[in-house]
From Swiss-Prot:
This is Pyridoxine/pyridoxamine 5'-phosphate oxidase. InterPro entries: Pyridox_Oxase, Pyridox_Oxase_CS, Pyridox_Oxase_N, Pyridoxamine_oxidase_dimer_C, Split_barrel_FMN-bd. It comes from the Bacteria. Its cofactor is FMN. The gene is pdxH. Binds 1 FMN per subunit. PANTHER family: PYRIDOXINE-5'-PHOSPHATE OXIDASE, PYRIDOXINE-5-PHOSPHATE OXIDASE. It catalyses: pyridoxamine 5'-phosphate + O2 + H2O = pyridoxal 5'-phosphate + H2O2 + NH4(+); pyridoxine 5'-phosphate + O2 = pyridoxal 5'-phosphate + H2O2. Homodimer.
């Protein structure tokens, strides 16, 4: 891990801790932007579940729209927006390649989830058409009956993705739109640079 990458990661960690201790309702909420095989972009909000020097991890159904996007075009952008921080909010953007996390990591995280969240992962065919809420409720009841009295295992089609950063951008909001921006970026040889940008 290079010094600049370590600096960017430490900056994120400090801001994330600040957000967790602030008025933010959900500091771990992040927008994940992906593109499908045709290059059509889409974005949605998910929760950050872990981060370290290897990257930023979230979990989902692998056959969801974002799961399919990431398996055919393994690049993503993350966006954190913490409006309550500092003078006028802080925004962090992270861009990078995407990898599936290991089965062991996915198993460990799935085992830590509330039981009804585990059941929901089995009952939901995420991003597919649903005829009615009653249909979903029936699927939930069926899964509950299937696993009554025993642990709920992780479904094969559910797991984690790790975004491996190739760029960080930190935006510090200020009055009169006189913001401050810093960008850390790796080149093709994984050499990191740091630049200040006009707001």
């Amino acid at each position: 891990m290079t010094d600049l990458y370590a600096e960017a990661l430490a900056t994120f960690a400090a801001l994330y801790a600040e957000a967790q201790n602030s008025a933010e309702l959900e500091a771990s909420a992040m927008t994940v932007a992906t593109a499908n095989v045709d290059g059509r972009p889409s974005a949605r909000t998910v929760l950050l579940k872990a981060f370290d020097a290897r990257g930023f991890v979230f979990y989902t159904h692998l056959d969801s729209a974002k799961g399919r996007d990431l398996q055919t075009h393994p690049q993503a952008a993350l966006l954190f927006l913490w409006r309550s921080l500092r003078e006028a909010g802080i925004q962090v953007r992270i861009e990078g390649g995407v990898q599936l996390v290991s089965a062991d990591e996915s198993d460990a995280y799935f085992a830590s989830r509330p039981r009804m969240s585990q059941i929901g992962a089995w009952a939901s065919r995420q991003s597919q058409a649903l005829g009615s809420r009653e249909e979903f409720d029936a699927a939930i009841a069926k899964v509950e009956a299937t696993f009554a009295g025993r642990e709920v295992p992780r479904p094969d089609g559910w797991g984690g993705f790790r975004v491996v950063p190739q760029a960080f951008e930190f935006w510090y909001g200020a009055k009169f739109r006189l913001h401050e921006r810093w960008r850390y970026e790796a080149d093709a040889a994984s050499h990191w640079s740091k630049r200040m940008l006009y707001p």
